[in-house]
Amino acid sequence: MAEETSLVADKVPEPAVIDAVADAMPDSLEDALRIVLMKARETNGLICGLSEVTRALDRRTAHLCVLADDCEDEEYKKLVTALAKQNNIDLVSMDEREKLAQWAGLTRMAADGSVRKTLKCSCLAVRDFGERTKALDYLLSQLQ
């Protein structure tokens, strides 16, 4: 019995490992945006889809909006741009809808872990950034 208590006392909790990728200084604005979207997705802070994004922009609950340049509908782009400008919400343009969807986690995965199908996402908004990282600081400094 005495040996069991000494073994329990000898166990030291291991320090938490910091995610080096998420806390690394990004090389570009695109890398910073990818990391920020990844962290926001972890905390359930992403809003996808026209209806949800326009509602969040109108209610001023979004902190950041990302709009794809290759969006099919010009009226869609005008609406999101106008709402973001009207409510003083930062708007970031992205080249491809598929890349934006992949960063937002809108992918179908195969059993082996590879990406089977990537959906398309024309617009998303960030309601909660999650934890504060160097990428978030870099992104916010570039937007001002």
Swiss-Prot record:
UniProt keyword list: Ribonucleoprotein, Ribosomal protein
Gene name of the record: RPS12
SUPFAM superfamilies documented for this protein: L30e-like
The name this protein goes by in its record: Small ribosomal subunit protein eS12
InterPro entries: Ribosomal_eL30-like_sf, Ribosomal_eL8/eL30/eS12/Gad45, Ribosomal_eS12, Ribosomal_eS12_CS
PROSITE patterns per record: RIBOSOMAL_S12E
One of the GO BP terms on file: translation
Keyword Ribosomal protein on entry: yes
Keyword Nucleotide-binding annotated: no
GO molecular function: structural constituent of ribosome
GO cellular component: cytoplasm; ribonucleoprotein complex; ribosome
Family from the record: Belongs to the eukaryotic ribosomal protein eS12 family.
